[in-house]
Amino acid sequence: MKKRVFSALLALVLTLSAVVLPASAAGSFSDVSDKKTAQNVEVLRLLGVVEGNGIGQFNPYAQLTRAEFCKMLVTLMGSSDVLRYKTVTIFRDVRASHWAARYVNYAVRGEKLLAGLPDGTFQPDRAISYGEAVTILMRLLRTDADAASGGIWPEGYIDLAKASGVSAGVELAGGAAISRAQAAQLFVNVLGAKATSSSTDKDGETSTTTRVYNPANCVSRERVTLIALNGNTARVSGGKKNSYDLVRPSSATVLNGLKGDLLLDADGKVLTFVPVVS
């Protein structure tokens, strides 16, 4: 009898906790109240793509600049090659001393995902447009993006983004500025999208490879149901193990109970968890 009463009380406590818990408390940032945004932001925070402003806020509705977008992009890519670009000056308004120089330089010269302006500037503090953002992301995912777009900018790239699922949950005019929350949605979509690369052999034969996009530092994925993030550990069900070490600690609850992919590094540690879109 006592055990039944205790179980009932425990269930009641858990239910009440779930009801009264504010949405912002479920994630890592106090100013993110939308559940979907909180999930996206936590996926990216685990990966190191977003950090907040140092006082526990993400500023989800603030416009994203071109420099900030490059930092998010390159961090998501997970390549250590970015370090080689931190002392380089390509644009006169992004000197080597600029906080985003390595990210801008790598995205422009290392990966050729975007370019500067005809006057030799990059305009790092200008708000990035939706058209610019999806163009960059489609170039990341497809080596033939420029050809596949039909040379129509930005409509051709926007159509590619829709077809690939990269723009799911975000619908804007090409010239519209994007918010930090909208950018988070785009980047999480990329982590679940297919990447296509084409190559030509010595005989002139072209082959195409398609796979789910992974950051460079991700060596494998594992489909699991996330039970909880407890500090430095992720507890899961349905995986090869019941728990995994996290690269970055988290106690956020917003991803709990979701099915998705653990992205694992070479040491078997969790870079992030990407929910599966049903």
Label each residue range with its predicted role.
Residues 2-38, 51-102, 109-177, 190-252, ...:
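Feature responds to low-complexity, polar/acidic, surface-exposed segments characteristic
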Residues 44, 106-107:
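PEST-like intrinsically disordered low-complexity regions enriched in serine, proline, threonine
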